[in-house]
A protein has these predicted regions:
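RNA substrate-binding interface of SAM-dependent RNA methyltransferases
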Residues: 5-10, 56, 64-148
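Active-site/ligand-binding-proximal alpha/beta "capping" segment
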Residues: 142-172
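Short loop/helix-cap segments at secondary-structure boundaries that form the rim of catalytic
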Residues: 23-29, 62-66, 134-135, 154, ...
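Ordered, amphipathic secondary-structure segments that act as subunit-interaction surfaces
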Residues: 46-56
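Short, polar loop motifs at secondary-structure junctions
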Residues: 17-22, 59-60, 129-130, 145-147, ...
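Short, hydrophobic beta-strand segments that form beta-sheet elements in well-ordered domains
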Residues: 12-18, 33-35, 56-57, 124-125, ...
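Short, glycine/polar-rich helix-capping loops at beta-to-alpha or helix-loop-helix junctions
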Residues: 21-24, 105-110, 170-172
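N-terminal positively charged helical leader segments and presequences
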Residues: 2-46, 133, 139
Length: 172
């Protein structure tokens, strides 16, 4: 919840198993707090041992016009892969992640767990990649075998986009 405060996420509803054992600061961030039982928590979490609290958040709105270092994701299917890409992008200082329609939902539970909260630190949007690339003011690098060049041989850029393709089909 400390990250929530820094990221500006608005918690609309908070669901907790034991409200009396939940930190008051966390409850203060939520517009509404509800008590749920363990059976409901297990159903919501999809895991054997739920964490004890769940939140409904307002989907963030981002100003993406100033993004200089962008990860473009072309239909990544596996939620664990997407979460890992989000977490790695956050650690690497990427400004924006743009996903093509057909990419896994960044707010799905498995993606959220794999991203370790990074989905709330970095703007993640869905857009038509061809349109985004046409409007982007910088080089776009892709992952492909044809005419491949080692990344260490490419001059460093302040503004760039990196395109990663689908697990089975690559970049379209």
């Amino acid at each position: 919840y400390k990250r929530q405060d820094q990221s500006g996420i608005v918690i609309k509803q908070l669901f907790v198993i034991e409200p009396n054992r939940t930190d008051e600061a966390l409850k203060d961030y939520a517009e509404e707090t509800f008590e749920i039982n363990m059976k409901v928590a297990e159903s919501l979490s999809g895991t054997i041992t739920p964490q004890g609290f769940f939140a409904v958040i307002e989907k963030p709105k981002y100003d993406v016009t100033q993004a200089k270092q962008v990860l473009l994701i072309d239909r990544i299917q596996d939620p664990g892969n997407l979460g890992t890409l989000i977490r790695t992008s956050d650690a690497a200082g990427i400004d924006l992640i743009v996903m093509e329609k057909g990419t896994a939902d960044p707010y799905q539970d498995k993606v959220l767990r794999a991203s370790q909260g990074s989905v709330f630190h970095i703007p993640v949007i869905t857009a038509d990649l061809k349109t985004f690339i046409a409007d982007f003011n910088g080089p776009v690098y892709g992952t492909a075998l044809e005419n491949a060049q080692p990344y260490k041989e490419i001059a460093s850029q302040d503004i760039f986009a990196l395109l990663l393709g689908n697990e089975g089909e690559g970049c379209l």
